[in-house]
Amino acid sequence: MEPDCSKRARSGWVRTAADLPTRPFTDRILGVATNLSKVSVLTLDYAEVKPRMARTTKRTYRAVPGSGVRRIWAGGQPSLSGGRLARQGFVYYAFDGWPIRDLARSFSAELAQELTEAENEVRRLNDDPPRTQLLEAVARQLLRSEAVASSRIEGFELSHRKLAEAAFDPEDTSLNARAVLGNVRAMDEAIRFASEQLDLTVTEIRTIHRRLFEGTRDAAIGGVIRNSQNWIGGRDNPWGARFIPVPEDQVTRLLDDLCRFAARDDLSAIAQAAIVHAQFETIHPFSDGNGRVGRSLIHLVLRRRGLAPYYVPPVSLILAANYEEYERGLTTFREEQVEEWCGIFARAVTIACRGAGELATRIEELKARWREQAGSPRADSAAAKLIDLLPVQPVLDMRTVQDALDVSDEAARLGIARLESAGILSEITKRKRGRAWESVGLFALLDSFERLVATPTGGSTPMRRAPRPTRRPSKIAAR
């Protein structure tokens, strides 16, 4: 009788030789497997049958990190990585998923206190009327900050200036810019859905994913749930992978289970968002874009629960700045140490809220300086309205101003001219037609904010570079 290899190795260790089942082509396993950080050798005796000849061959394979579901990389095909090993094949383990629908809602006193503190910070951010009004004015730019940070976790580097230019002129953008714009669209979709107070469905998850890839060269994979094994890290095979998600035949069942858990209202909204995100990362239902969709679900859960009706703090900024702790937290969740992961997430939310409050204060101060520079324009003037618009639309042209402020061509022209002469706007096209301007000071402020949250907290070293100070304006094509 074969040993049961479907159980999860809760400590993160791959099964030992004694635990592995016998297969027709793996008669004996002589070595032992490994843990998640070190790779040991597996030696297999098996019969290799070829036409007109049969022989028994001993080959040395390695075990790829993972746990739970034993799988075989068949090999026999050219490989961009892994060399002879990938061509010969090897044994690896996919994570054996576990349901969360009925996860207990009770937590330790220490975690309950951290969750309460995080929830209070989110409420304070949304309930303070003056601050909320300001955050709503800049929410679009901060959502882009969240998208930049979330995309940076996936390896896409883009400055706030470049993203603003891409949003202004989507047709003339780099592939990285389009990818980050897709992340903004995905978060927009999550927020739109949450505002309708509907329960999360697999269909909506696919819609968010589809929005992520709209307008990119990978648009064809948008919304398509995978039908084969995937892995995180490594290259074109599981060798060297940091984590191997659940097998493809578990994806649909676990997504349905995740949606049922997301519909619950009997536990902390912060804990619920943390668990939904970690479980989605563990399922990894798509061939690409899972992390960005998973972080969009944080917004969806917190808005749906009513904790953050106006503004979700930029949690991805904190997770990206402390990426090592983020990865460790996801690993502990997969080992069913749910409390440790929820604590990491709750602390990230608390820091993000406080950082967002600091950013709001700095933007308030910047707008006050702009008004002073512009000579204190009347509240109903195009110049005053334009100052309020700049945090949301830092790159603009005449048509943008006319549409956003509902003013005439002449009023828009005079408003732009007044702010340009005051040093608040700077032209970035240098053309007579198709002229565009950007706000002076906002990008430096946003970069400063990112450097602030990238500062180590609690002894943790940020795993990404803090953004460099803003340099001279770049040029963009005429619209």
Language-model features and meaning:
Residues 4-6, 19-479:
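FIC/Doc superfamily catalytic core
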